[in-house]
């Protein structure tokens, strides 16, 4: 019933613009309001969608807003903010970031993750494609399809999800992921923004090297333990 309602609203009030992504588990489309012209993202995915239900109650300038979440027979439908801008991956097609540019992006990313981690939300897929810079220059963290809620007494994740090269070792079933998992990915992201390569191929050799090295330690206890600590060391 809920899904029929949301599909009816989309059909009556919005016009399809384009398909952003389609996999066996998710479909992401952009729609434009017929009268107001405002664009939104409609995400249909399999699974419980518990992270999106949690995100619906949160608001942060560096996180794409989730407007509504509705259960369906096979998963959930999510209506979320459309971010007009380019991803870090798009920018890297034209050149590398300066150290000051990296500090600006990562500082905002740390602010977003500080809120998420305080609600036990682990993103698990931080990479250039999931970090956007909007038309006003604001950083926006997007795509929570791989995210999970941290469970204090769980020994490991039920699913190994992430992007190879950015995923921390514990994402492959060694231990449960936690906020330090996202810190690992931030370290890889910083190195890619500065060199175009992951640290194991070409480690950045400037002042941010020590931050990257600490973020990407194999053992979580040897990394920064939270994003506040990471941000202080940028």
Regions found by a protein language model. Name each.
Residues 15-53:
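ATP-binding glycine-rich loop module of kinase domains
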Residues 59-68:
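Conserved HxN/HPN-centered segment at the entrance to the catalytic loop
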Residues 73-87, 91:
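Conserved short submotifs of the Hanks-type protein kinase catalytic core
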Residues 105-106:
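Activation segment signature within eukaryotic-like protein kinase domains
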Residues 117-133:
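Catalytic-loop of the protein kinase fold
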Residues 157-170:
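Conserved activation segment of eukaryotic-like protein kinases, specifically the C-terminal portion
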Residues 182:
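Conserved catalytic-loop aspartate of Hanks-type protein kinases
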């Amino acid at each position: 019933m809920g899904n029929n309602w949301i599909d009816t609203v989309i059909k009556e009030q919005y016009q399809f613009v384009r398909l952003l992504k389609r996999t066996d588990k998710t479909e992401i489309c952009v729609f434009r309001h017929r009268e107001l012209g405002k664009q939104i993202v409609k995400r249909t995915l399999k699974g419980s969608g518990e992270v999106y239900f949690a995100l619906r109650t949160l608001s942060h300038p560096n996180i794409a807003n989730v407007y509504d979440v509705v259960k369906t027979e096979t998963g959930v439908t999510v209506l979320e903010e459309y971010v007009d801008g380019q991803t870090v991956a798009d920018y890297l097609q034209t050149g590398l970031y300066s150290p000051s540019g990296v500090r600006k992006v990562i500082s905002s990313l740390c602010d977003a993750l500080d809120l998420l981690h305080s609600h036990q939300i682990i993103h698990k897929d931080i990479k250039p494609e999931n970090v956007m810079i909007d038309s006003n220059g604001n950083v926006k963290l997007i795509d929570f399809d791989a995210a999970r809620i941290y469970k204090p007494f769980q020994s490991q994740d039920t699913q190994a999800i992430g992007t190879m090269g950015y995923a921390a070792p514990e994402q492959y079933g060694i231990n449960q992921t936690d906020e330090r998992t996202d810190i690992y990915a931030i370290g890889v992201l910083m190195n890619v923004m500065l060199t175009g390569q992951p640290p194991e191929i070409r480690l950045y050799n400037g002042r941010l090297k020590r931050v990257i090295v600490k973020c990407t330690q194999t053992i979580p206890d040897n990394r920064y333990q939270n994003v506040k600590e990471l941000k202080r060391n940028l």
